[in-house]
Amino acid sequence: MPSTLIHVSLALLLAAGLLGTEFDGRSVLVVAAATAVPDLDVALEPVLSGAHRSVGHNFVLPGLVLLALAADLRRGPDSLLHRRYGDRGVTLAFTAVVCLVGAGIVPDLVVGGINAFYPLHDAFYTVDGRLFYSTDRGWVQTFVDLSPDDPEPQRTTSNFDFRTVLDAEPTLGVEDSGGGSGEAGGGGGSQRVERLFPVAMTGFRAWLLPLAAFVTGTRLWRARRSANAGVDGGDRA
């Protein structure tokens, strides 16, 4: 699983791209702290089985934070956040939430899985697969399987838990599963070469695509808005 350092590193890249010239030492501390919050659930593992990747690694937590921010900002001039930190504080708060989700939670969703809707719904989910173009098969994706084989039992906190640094032998996770069968060898007929053009061969790499698009689009939008504001200011002068 990605380490906390990896999560924070990705978050700082996100924040640097989103905040631009507003990215400073305070931003680093706020973003790093927000991104590290999910991994604190490892401390609850000894007293709450399945806490890791559940208590902190879910979409309910950032949802509640967004609701709290929205409720505060609806107060207008009486907004505690805006009154104390101004527009910059509001921007930093929402950036921290984006980093919490984009760098703190989703990377674990695509590497091993998380209890995405805990405690509202106790079930671990993993988004993983491959996307590529094949000269034989055309576009191939395995992220969404519309005709799955016999489903495996749903992972929950009662039958699955991730090994952590608190365990003697940390692993990616443990669960009861049957032995997998190897793929059969090739058949007869003429040989031909299949050429693959990789796009995203793992869930983590697939997540980087929309993430990069989001950061790039946001930075371009903010740059355009700043440029337009400068032009309008010059016209008034």
Model-assigned labels for residue ranges:
Residues 1-237:
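N-terminal membrane-targeting hydrophobic helices
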